[in-house]
């Protein structure tokens, strides 16, 4: 029986209050959540369908449902009474509200559609479909605006459009529309934020913009005062420039006075700022030049802070800032009207097609629940409401939950230190506000319980995390103080390992190198250097041991124990993957980007671009060099050398005009093809045109023959599907399709290709830190720690913020100049702080993934200079100026006892400061890039040695008796004959379906089958119907992916199939072959009912087993002992207490009710499945079934 900690037990047992459970990383929050639910069911006798359990992903909801089902069955097995009540809970589990916010909203809207006049038959629009609708709505809106000729519109275009186009203004409308969807009442919020611009100087002083600016300036001025205090200390040291003290104290007094003036109206601060006057330093001849320079440097930095405020924040007066805002009011008002106009048109288009998007669902539900009768219905229904991952909520979701909660029935669990989804508009301040205001004692109506014990990581990892984050995370930066409440505490004991210290590898970019190496190093990208060093470390790790509690002993580290975490996978993941493959390390990169970078997609888009406009050099050269153009590099050079002016297409035309060689006629043929395709594009629908290009060029077949051909073909099919969806809109033509695709790219609409990986595959994982959240690994390598933060969010013409509203630049149309408004300046500061806080929490997530070992890797330039900077970075101002993760990590480590190597490198004389948290152990390695080059040179020398031996091999010596030790062996190998020629005809591997076909008695047919190289897509075959085999494949796929907890009706099944179509798992045509009535009948048949109630269900499970050839192939001689591999896929099996149940689905037509004939056809196949399952699981298959969809019947074999 599990032993709960005191805090966990309190979270499980507490009743009569709203609970916020602040659950640290690895603290067992999900287990606590499930146990609380079970105890509510058991002790409070509340049915599971009276609970609302909200998660943030469908996967999390499914896992939660499985965990609850497992916990209920465990309780039933105890036979302590109440089994009937628990059985009832299992039957209710299918309709229990364990759901995402969006799924809950769907339920609310479908139940109460009449209250808001929404078609109950709505479907959720595909992202591409809704993107096209947005584009259409925007184009129509702007066309109407140009026709109206309104002056304010043209002023808006001039202020926020591009130099020659209005695309930036269109993008701004879309950006504002998307942003305000995170508000409960978007249009009201936007209207109020526009009215903020019509303010007086008195209102300006009280505005949130000024409050934010004051907060920022307070941090800056405190930073300046800290620098001056350090300078004063240095000035008074022995040998220090003590004559500087007068000026330093004068500076300090003035800045302190300026700091205190922040408590007054901003006009007072502005006046005080302009009164500051820094006096000159006195001459100091006898002082230590190093101390003198250091002192002057610190003072200059403090002065620069004041200068920055004067020149970049208050370079104009408060009155001028107010005037700017007032003059912007008409533009902001018209911008509001554009956003509303776009919203109305977009909504109309969705209504016409009967679709909604996810934002609609939330706002529809809010409108319904604003009606107290509807809200009261849910208050009465749900005895308790649970919100998982509460730190990732936004204000819309918060408003939804608050509208249906009672006074004391809300349970929220999460960890604000792991709130890393601000880019999805998550709002961690919702968690923080409750964290700071909820009481910790029993009896509070709003109560907070902290789960601080970590059961994932060994103590050395936890100590390191605590040490780093105590030095960097605070209320000002990180949005929460990393104090005793936030720290991690070890929750379980670990067996010792050889080196538990946290390892940090600093790769110095500019370490002194030999001149010979310089050229090679310049060619070696920073990413590749890190990748190679990580690869080398991985190889070394394989010789180390960890303790594995599953085997109750030590074992060697395997590839699958290791994960490489990256802040961004773009460029980095692929580079690491390529290096690992070269080094013989099996690896898998889990990246969400790369679709548009895939060579086949990029090339085909370039072909479309060239057909649309041949005078684009890069796309044209790409197509010509590809298999479609089939030009060699030499031919391309000849064309350009002949004419070095103009576009490359001009050079082609000139070559055709002047030359008479074979290349000319090759070019003529190529141009004719392009012209023909350009003509076709004018008259053929874009999807049909892409189909035609696939056929004309044969490119689809070509990529199918490349490594990863099936994936490449799938990528091209996605492009065809995009064109098919585009064709359904009112926007037509090749140019507009290319424009649409490029808009998807620029709006980060890229998507990674689907990849499948089993958790037991022995490979190193490469993934983003975001993807790793919630996961754990024995060894974690965080790489790219020296990569600079991306803070470009503050560079846009108009910034947006949930609290500060709109932050536009001010443009003077007369002077044709622009400057930042006070609103934009405030938002720049606030967004930077929030972005850095998020980066800090991302680092926390990365550092809390390892169970046994954490290895940190990062590249750094001018390490001595950086170390000195780190040694002085001990306040919020310094941490806010960090450029990357290493700046934060280094700031803490330079003060740690194990940081002596860093202190020596930076020429620092101080000892480590003791702060009670130096229990952490660190190994700090400083590496040079030349290590990699030396290894490469060593490899080259070995290869040259082998080549030299081959070069001087003497054939005459070999013939005349030399090399006798090799000659006999070579002759034996060349003259060798295989002793069992019959075995050559036996295949090494067969599928179960091959075996089934007439029990296989044609050995030669088996041995000489050559599979088709590539598979044509349905759209290229011109099919309008599906074969029986294809229908079966679709039905199997649907059965594999259906959520078994949502199959209560045909409508439930149809909705899930619509979801599969929307996400392009199956096509619209494929979905039509699925008979939902048949599927429903299966789930409610006797065997289907047993399957749905099972504790664990496994679907589409592949297997490979070894069999004697004689057992499988008829007609073989008895003395043949050859083995072969039999592979297959088991449709479904599930666990019951006393064994496994195996089900195989069949869509065969049962003629004249002759079920026995169908069963006979599959007896051998099912016996192989049964044998495979028993051998793989080690458990008995107690029952085997064929489910025949034709007669809606399960038949036991």
From Swiss-Prot:
SUPFAM superfamilies: P-loop containing nucleoside triphosphate hydrolases, Restriction endonuclease-like. GO terms for biological process: double-strand break repair via homologous recombination. Residues 485-774 form the UvrD-like helicase C-terminal domain. One of its GO terms (cellular component) is cytosol. Residues 2-458 form the UvrD-like helicase ATP-binding domain. Its cofactor is Mg(2+). It comes from the Bacteria. GO terms for molecular function: 3'-5' DNA helicase activity; 3'-5' exonuclease activity; ATP binding; ATP hydrolysis activity; double-stranded DNA binding. Keywords: ATP-binding, DNA damage, DNA repair, DNA-binding, Exonuclease, Helicase, Hydrolase, Isomerase, Nuclease, Nucleotide-binding. Transmembrane segments: none annotated. Its EC number is 3.1.-.-, 5.6.2.4. CDD domains: DEXQc_UvrD (cd17932). ATP binds at residues 23-30. It catalyses: Couples ATP hydrolysis with the unwinding of duplex DNA by translocating in the 3'-5' direction; ATP + H2O = ADP + phosphate + H(+). The heterodimer acts as both an ATP-dependent DNA helicase and an ATP-dependent, dual-direction single-stranded exonuclease. Recognizes the chi site generating a DNA molecule suitable for the initiation of homologous recombination. The AddA nuclease domain is required for chi fragment generation; this subunit has the helicase and 3' -> 5' nuclease activities. Belongs to the helicase family. AddA subfamily. Heterodimer of AddA and AddB/RexB. This is ATP-dependent helicase/nuclease subunit A.
């Amino acid at each position: 029986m599990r032993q709960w900690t005191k805090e966990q037990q309190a979270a499980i047992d507490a009743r009569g209050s709203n609970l916020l459970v602040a659950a640290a990383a690895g603290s067992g929050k999900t287990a606590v959540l499930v146990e609380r639910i079970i105890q509510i069911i058991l002790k409070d006798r509340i049915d599971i369908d009276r609970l609302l359990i909200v998660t943030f992903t469908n996967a999390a909801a499914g896992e939660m449902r499985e965990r609850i089902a497992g916990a209920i069955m465990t309780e039933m097995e105890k036979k302590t009474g109440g089994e009937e009540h628990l059985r009832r809970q299992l039957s209710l589990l299918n309709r229990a509200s364990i759901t995402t916010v969006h799924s809950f909203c769907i339920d609310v809207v479908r139940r109460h559609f009449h209250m808001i006049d929404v078609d109950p038959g709505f479907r959720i629009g595909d992202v591409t479909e809704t993107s096209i609708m947005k584009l259409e709505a925007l184009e129509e809106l702007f066309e109407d605006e140009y026709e109206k000729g309104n002056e304010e519109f043209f002023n808006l275009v001039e202020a926020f459009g591009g130099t020659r186009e209005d695309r930036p203004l269109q993008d701004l409308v879309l950006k504002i529309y998307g942003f305000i969807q995170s508000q409960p009442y978007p249009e009201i919020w936007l209207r109020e934020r526009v009215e903020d611009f019509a303010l007086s100087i008195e209102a300006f002083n009280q505005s949130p913009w000024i409050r934010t600016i004051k907060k920022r300036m307070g941090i800056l001025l405190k930073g300046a005062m800290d620098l001056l205090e350090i300078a004063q200390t240095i000035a008074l040291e022995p040998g220090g420039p003590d004559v500087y003290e007068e000026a330093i104290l004068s500076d300090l007094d003035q800045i302190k006075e300026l700091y205190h003036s922040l408590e007054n109206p901003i006009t007072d601060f502005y006046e005080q700022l302009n009164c500051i006057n820094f006096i000159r330093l006195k001459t100091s001849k006898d002082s230590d030049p190093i101390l003198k320079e250091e002192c002057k440097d610190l003072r200059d930095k403090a002065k620069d802070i004041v200068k920055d405020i004067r020149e970049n924040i208050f370079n104009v007066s408060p009155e001028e800032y107010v005037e700017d805002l007032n003059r912007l009011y008409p533009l902001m008002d018209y911008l509001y009207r554009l956003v509303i106009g776009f919203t109305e048109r977009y909504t109309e288009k969705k209504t016409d097609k009967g679709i909604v998007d996810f934002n609609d669902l939330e706002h529809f539900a809010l409108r319904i629940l604003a009606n107290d009768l509807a809200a009261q219905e849910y208050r009465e229904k749900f005895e308790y409401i649970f919100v998982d991952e509460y730190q990732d909520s936004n204000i819309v979701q918060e408003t939804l939950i608050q509208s249906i909660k009672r006074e004391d029935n809300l349970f929220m669990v999460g960890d604000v230190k792991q709130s890393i989804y601000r880019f999805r508009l998550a709002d961690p301040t919702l968690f923080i506000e409750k964290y700071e205001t909820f009481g910790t004692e029993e009896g509070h109506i709003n109560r907070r319980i902290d789960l601080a014990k970590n059961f994932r990581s060994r103590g050395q990892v936890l100590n390191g995390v605590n040490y780093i984050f105590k030095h960097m995370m605070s209320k000002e930066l990180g949005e929460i103080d990393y104090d005793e409440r936030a720290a991690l505490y070890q929750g379980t004991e670990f067996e010792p390992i050889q080196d538990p210290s946290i390892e940090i590898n600093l790769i110095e970019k500019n370490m002194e190198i030999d001149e010979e190496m310089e050229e090679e190093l310049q060619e070696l990208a920073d990413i590749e250097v890190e990748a190679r060093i990580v690869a080398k470390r991985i190889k070394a790790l394989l010789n180390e041991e960890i303790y594995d509690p599953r085997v109750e002993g030590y074992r060697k580290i395997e590839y699958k124990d290791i994960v490489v975490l990256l802040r961004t996978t773009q460029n980095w993941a692929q580079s690491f993957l390529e290096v690992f493959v070269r080094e013989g390390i099996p690896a898998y990169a889990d990246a969400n980007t790369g679709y548009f970078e895939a060579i086949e997609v990029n090339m085909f888009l370039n072909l479309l671009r060239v057909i649309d406009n041949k005078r684009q050099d890069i796309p044209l050269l790409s197509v010509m060099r590809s298999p479609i153009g089939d030009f060699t590099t030499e031919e391309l050079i000849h064309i350009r050398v002949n004419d070095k002016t103009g576009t490359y297409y001009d050079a082609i035309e000139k070559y055709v005009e002047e030359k008479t060689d074979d290349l000319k006629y090759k070019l003529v043929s190529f141009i004719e093809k392009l012209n023909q395709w350009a003509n076709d594009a004018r008259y053929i629908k874009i999807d049909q045109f892409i189909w035609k290009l696939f056929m004309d060029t044969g490119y689809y077949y070509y990529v199918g023959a490349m490594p990863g051909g099936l994936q490449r073909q799938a990528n091209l099919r996605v492009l065809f599907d995009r064109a098919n969806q585009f064709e359904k809109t009112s926007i037509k033509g090749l140019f507009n399709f290319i424009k649409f695709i490029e808009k998807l790219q620029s709006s980060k609409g890229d998507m990674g290709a689907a990849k499948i990986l089993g958790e037991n595959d022995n490979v190193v994982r490469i993934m983003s830190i975001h993807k790793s959240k919630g996961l754990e690994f024995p060894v974690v390598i965080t790489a790219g720690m020296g990569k600079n933060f991306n803070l470009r969010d503050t560079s846009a013409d108009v910034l947006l913020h949930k609290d500060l509203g709109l932050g536009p630049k001010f443009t003077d149309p007369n002077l044709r100049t622009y400057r930042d408004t006070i609103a934009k300046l405030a938002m720049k500061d606030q967004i930077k702080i929030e972005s850095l806080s998020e980066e800090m929490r991302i680092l926390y997530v990365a550092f809390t993934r390892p169970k046994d070992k954490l290895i940190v890797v990062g590249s750094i330039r001018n390490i001595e200079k950086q170390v000195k900077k780190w040694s002085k970075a001990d306040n919020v101002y310094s941490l806010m100026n960090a450029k990357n993760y290493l700046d934060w990590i280094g700031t803490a480590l330079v003060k740690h006892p194990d940081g002596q190597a860093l202190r020596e490198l930076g020429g620092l004389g101080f000892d480590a400061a003791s702060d009670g948290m130096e229990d952490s152990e660190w190994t700090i390695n400083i590496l040079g890039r030349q290590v990699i080059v030396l290894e490469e040179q060593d490899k080259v020398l070995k290869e040259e040695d082998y080549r030299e031996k081959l070069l001087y091999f003497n054939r005459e010596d070999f013939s005349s008796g030399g090399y006798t030790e090799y000659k006999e062996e070579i002759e034996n190998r060349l003259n060798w004959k295989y002793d069992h020629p019959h075995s050559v005809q036996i295949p090494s591997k067969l599928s179960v379906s091959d075996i089934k076909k007439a029990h296989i008695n044609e050995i030669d047919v088996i041995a000489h089958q050559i599979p088709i190289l590539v598979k044509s897509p349905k759209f290229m075959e011109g099919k309008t119907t599906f074969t029986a085999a294809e229908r079966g494949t679709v039905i199997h796929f649907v059965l594999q992916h259906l959520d078994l907890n949502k199959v209560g009706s045909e409508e439930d099944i149809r909705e899930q199939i619509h979801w599969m179509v929307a996400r392009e798992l199956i096509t619209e045509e494929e979905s039509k072959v699925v008979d939902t009535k048949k599927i429903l009948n299966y789930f409610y048949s006797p065997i289907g009912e047993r399957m749905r109630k099972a504790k664990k269900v496994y679907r589409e499970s592949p297997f490979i087993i070894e069999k004697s050839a004689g057992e499988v192939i008829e007609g073989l001689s008895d003395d043949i002992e050859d083995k072969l591999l039999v592979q297959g896929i088991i449709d479904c099996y599930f666990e019951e207490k006393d064994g496994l149940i195996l089900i195989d689905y069949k869509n065969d037509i049962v003629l004249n009710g002759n079920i026995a004939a169908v069963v006979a056809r599959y007896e051998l196949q099912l016996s192989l499945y049964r044998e495979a399952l028993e051998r793989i699981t080690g458990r008995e298959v107690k029952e085997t079934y064929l489910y025949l969809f034709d007669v809606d019947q399960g038949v036991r074999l």
